[in-house]
Amino acid sequence: MALPILLDCDPGHDDAIAIVLALASPELDVKAITSSAGNQTPEKTLRNVLRMLTLLNRTDIPVAGGAVKPLMRELIIADNVHGESGLDGPALPEPAFAPQNCTAVELMAKTLRESAEPITIVSTGPQTNVALLLNSHPELHSKIARIVIMGGAMGLGNWTPAAEFNIYVDPEAAEIVFQSGIPVVMAGLDVTHRAQIHVEDTERFRAIGNPVSTIVAELLDFFLEYHKDEKWGFVGAPLHDPCTIAWLLKPELFTTVERWVGVETQGKYTQGMTVVDYYYLTGNKPNATVMVDVDRQGFVDLLADRLKFYA
């Protein structure tokens, strides 16, 4: 039986590819997709969800737009990474359908309420919508199987020296998620920076030759440009968000540890840092499954295999 999931995202090139991977996988049943502000403004990320679902001919999936800003801060966007539209590069279709006439939190709550079994929430942007859901609907916590997030890092940040972008945008929301008591799975930079797509991988995807694999290759062409900066030391581009979906499909590709994670919301230099108690120094019980490594080739092979679904 397919695993029911709710996807909360801020497309974004890697979010878009996470959507492609999820909808090519019969093991997953995507119940709804909600958008968050992050990689671009809330209007643009919502539009990008609709554009991707139009491309994939999945206009049956309910979509709703989420919070327009973080819980307690002004919005920061990553237009330097994802371009003016949030999905610069390929020519994507205009949306062929409209979002639901409700908020992301309302759609999430309705989906959880109507489900006969607990649902996994996959969140690949800032955690604002998920935190609002948890705070406003404590009665639905038992309907959430787990929350799989792309965010954070045990080691180095990518937006500040200490902080990964998604967590930095709304650290208060991330702290609510980690301390919620619901099982959390964290795909942080420690693993996503190992999930790099090389130029030859992009050409492999392009050679699959269907419209969706071609769009994915064109998304990666654009995404690779930002990551060519020598400061990163990358061979290719880290495909952050699809790690969440890949873990659900093939957890054996990933090495994980069970640890306590907290989020720094106050620090002068460390605001947005995910503090991972790797050596059990705090005495706190683990609250997260933290990904620390990935079989890169297996990850690439999974993506290539699933792109053939769109032939």
Swiss-Prot record:
Keywords: Glycosidase, Hydrolase
Active-site residues, record numbering mapped to chain: 240
EC numbers, comma separated: 3.2.-.-
Entries under InterPro entries matching the protein: I/U_nuclsd_hydro_CS (IPR015910), Inosine/uridine_hydrolase_dom (IPR001910), IUNH (IPR023186), Pyrim_hydro_RihA (IPR022975), Ribo_hydro-like (IPR036452)
Hydrolase listed as a keyword: yes
Gene Ontology terms describing biological process: nucleobase-containing small molecule interconversion; purine nucleoside catabolic process; pyrimidine nucleobase metabolic process
Signal sequence bounds: none
Repeat as UniProt keyword: no
Disulfide bonds: none
Superkingdom: Bacteria
Molecular functions per Gene Ontology: purine nucleosidase activity; uridine nucleosidase activity
GO CC terms of this entry: cytosol
Family from the record: Belongs to the IUNH family. RihA subfamily.
HAMAP family registered for this protein in UniProt: Pyrim_hydro_RihA
Role description: Hydrolyzes with equal efficiency cytidine or uridine to ribose and cytosine or uracil, respectively.
PANTHER family, sorted: INOSINE-URIDINE PREFERRING NUCLEOSIDE HYDROLASE, URIDINE NUCLEOSIDASE
Protein known as: Pyrimidine-specific ribonucleoside hydrolase RihA
Gene: rihA
